[in-house]
Swiss-Prot record:
The lineage of its organism: Bacteria, Pseudomonadati, Elusimicrobiota, Elusimicrobia, Elusimicrobiales. Keywords: Cell cycle, Cell division, Cell inner membrane, Cell membrane, Cell shape, Cell wall biogenesis/degradation, Glycosyltransferase, Membrane, Peptidoglycan synthesis, Transferase. Its EC number is 2.4.1.227. It catalyses: di-trans,octa-cis-undecaprenyl diphospho-N-acetyl-alpha-D-muramoyl-L-alanyl-D-glutamyl-meso-2,6-diaminopimeloyl-D-alanyl-D-alanine + UDP-N-acetyl-alpha-D-glucosamine = di-trans,octa-cis-undecaprenyl diphospho-[N-acetyl-alpha-D-glucosaminyl-(1->4)]-N-acetyl-alpha-D-muramoyl-L-alanyl-D-glutamyl-meso-2,6-diaminopimeloyl-D-alanyl-D-alanine + UDP + H(+). It comes from the Bacteria. GO terms for cellular component: plasma membrane. Pfam families: Glyco_tran_28_C, Glyco_transf_28. InterPro entries: GlcNAc_MurG (IPR006009), Glyco_trans_28_C (IPR007235), GlycoTrans_28_N (IPR004276). One of its GO terms (biological process) is carbohydrate metabolic process. This is UDP-N-acetylglucosamine--N-acetylmuramyl-(pentapeptide) pyrophosphoryl-undecaprenol N-acetylglucosamine transferase. Pathway: Cell wall biogenesis; peptidoglycan biosynthesis. PANTHER family: GLYCOSYLTRANSFERASE, UDP-N-ACETYLGLUCOSAMINE--N-ACETYLMURAMYL-(PENTAPEPTIDE) PYROPHOSPHORYL-UNDECAPRENOL N-ACETYLGLUCOSAMINE TRANSFERASE 1. It comes from Elusimicrobium minutum (strain Pei191).
């Protein structure tokens, strides 16, 4: 039986593509071991799904000048580097796969030193620092999105998303179950795992103004736990607006919506692509290397999304744009066709494509 190590964790954007790959490799009767950060939130999901894992005490390179942070980084780097060697020596993998982020680094470097085949996956169009370094040591570099960065031996494979996005569903039932009217145009709003107060408030102002003047559109806002109480006060008495702290089946709600307002992380981009949903993208302004901006620009250039930078004028810009398209369905149809220009791999098949690739190493 062939053995695979998958370094995956830190954020949902790095973990869930790796988790999808792990499930696909297990279907093929391979043994899979995950390497994750110590006390990673991903451990709960791995345990629930009976995956073996090992923890390393690693952290990302500090981007501040604080010397204490650099000292802590150096200490954790040395410790985790040797932890990783112990994991590899004990498990004896045939292939190591890094799914992006700093966790990939020690795994991919040791794979190179020990002559083990490896692959690295980056979901973003702007390649991260750790992955740029890993690219020098790996056999093949797998791209979630096209990139202009100078990386050798690449293959465009897409970013895996949850298989639930491919399930059959009934739009009317999905909307009615949330107190929404299936006869109205539906705008879905969510901020991702790094949703912010500024984004929530700008969008709430927009939604309130639009429903006062237009009774043919409704909003469903997934706020996150932190923003929920404040927004509940904001939306009190507003018609055609539904607020939820969390949505466990966003895969149905996104497909039921006519339009989406969201961040532009790589997993969200892949989900929008799979659903062919017109969108307004508001990049998380503190993302490393501003990668969400570049992800969003890919969709904007194809005509399937608009992009606004988070700032003081966000609320009026959102209001003007969404109010305009809510009156013109032809714009939405044009934006949906824009996805055809991208010609990306099907995110619902990306896990299979990646598994085929690493299987062949």
């Amino acid at each position: 039986m062939r053995k695979f190590i998958i370094a995956s964790g830190g954020t949902g954007g790095h973990f869930y593509p790796g988790f999808s790959l792990g499930k696909e490799l297990r279907k093929r009767s391979y043994e899979v071991l995950f390497v994750v950060r110590k006390e990673d939130a991903a451990i709960k999901t791995l345990t629930k799904n009976n995956f073996n894992y090992k923890e390393i005490n690693f952290t990302g390179f500090p981007r501040s000048a604080n010397p204490i942070r650099h000292i802590i980084f150096c200490y954790k780097f040395i410790v985790s580097f040797w932890q990783t060697l112990g994991i590899i020596n004990a498990f004896k993998p045939d292939v190591c796969v890094g799914m992006g982020g700093y966790l990939s680094f020690p795994v991919i470097v040791w794979a190179k030193i020990k002559g083990i085949k490896s692959a690295v996956h980056d979901s973003n169009t702007k390649i991260g620092l750790a992955n740029k370094i890993c690219a020098k040591f790996t056999n093949i570099f797998l791209l979630g999105l096209p990139t202009s960065d100078n990386i050798k031996n690449t293959k465009l494979v897409g970013t895996p998303i949850r298989e639930e996005f491919g399930l059959d569903f009934n739009r009317e039932e999905v909307l009615k179950s949330r107190g929404l009217n299936p006869n109205l145009a539906t705008v879905l709003i969510f901020g991702g795992s790094q949703g912010s107060k500024k984004l929530n408030m700008a969008i709430s102002k927009t939604a309130k103004k639009i429903v006062k003047k237009n009774d043919t559109v409704q909003f469903v806002h997934i706020s996150g736990d932190k923003g929920y109480d404040k927004l509940r006060q904001e939306y009190r008495g507003c018609k055609n607006i539904r607020l939820f702290a969390y949505c466990h089946d966003i895969y149905f709600l996104m497909r039921a919506a006519d339009f989406v307002v969201c961040r532009s992380g790589a997993s969200t981009i892949a989900e929008l692509y799979a659903c062919r949903k017109p969108a307004v993208l508001i990049p998380f302004p503190y993302a490393a290397d501003n990668h969400q901006y570049y992800n969003g620009m890919l969709l904007k250039k194809a005509g399937c999304a608009e992009l606004f930078v988070e700032g003081d004028n966000l609320a009026p810009k959102l209001h003007e744009y969404i109010a305009g398209i809510s009156k013109n369905k032809n714009i939405l149809e044009f934006m949906e066709r824009g996805y055809e220009m991208l010609e990306l791999p099907d995110p619902l098949k990306s896990a299979e494509i990646i598994a085929d690739t690493v299987e062949s190493l």
